[in-house]
């Protein structure tokens, strides 16, 4: 058991880690090499991540998020990093942690209401320019 697990993570965190790991092993790992060749992550995988709630872990519930603590984000990044693809990890992590985090902290209420629900669901993809 690591210090992180011993001192900070609850049973709910561990259950989330297992759920995410099982999801990645089924929906990502078998296909990630082809995605690297194609230089593209299929839109369907973003929708699946959205359906599982992975894009809204620390987002407010009123936008479709789960309003969970920071440790869920840490677990998400750790597990995605184990998927043997830097391209996939960067692509799937940029959406919630680069684009959506800016909306969460900087956008007006009107912009949050317009963009966050569809972005959290995986229907829309965020980007930085």
Language model features: what each stretch is:
Residues 1-12:
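Intrinsic disorder at enzyme termini
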Residues 12-26:
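A non-catalytic, amphipathic alpha-helix used as a structural packing/dimerization or gating element
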Residues 29-129:
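Glycine-rich flavin
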């Amino acid at each position: 058991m690591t210090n992180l697990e011993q001192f900070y993570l609850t049973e709910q965190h561990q259950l989330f880690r297992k759920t995410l790991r099982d999801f990645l092993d089924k929906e990502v790992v078998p296909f990630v090499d082809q995605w690297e060749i194609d230089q593209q992550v299929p839109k369907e995988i973003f929708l699946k991540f959205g359906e599982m709630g992975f894009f809204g872990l620390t987002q407010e519930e009123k936008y479709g998020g789960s309003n969970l603590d920071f440790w869920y984000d840490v677990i998400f990044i750790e597990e995605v990093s184990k998927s043997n693809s830097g391209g996939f990890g960067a692509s799937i992590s940029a959406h919630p942690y680069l684009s959506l985090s800016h909306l969460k902290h900087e956008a007006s209420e009107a912009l949050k209401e317009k963009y966050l629900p569809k972005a959290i669901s995986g229907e829309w993809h965020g980007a930085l320019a």
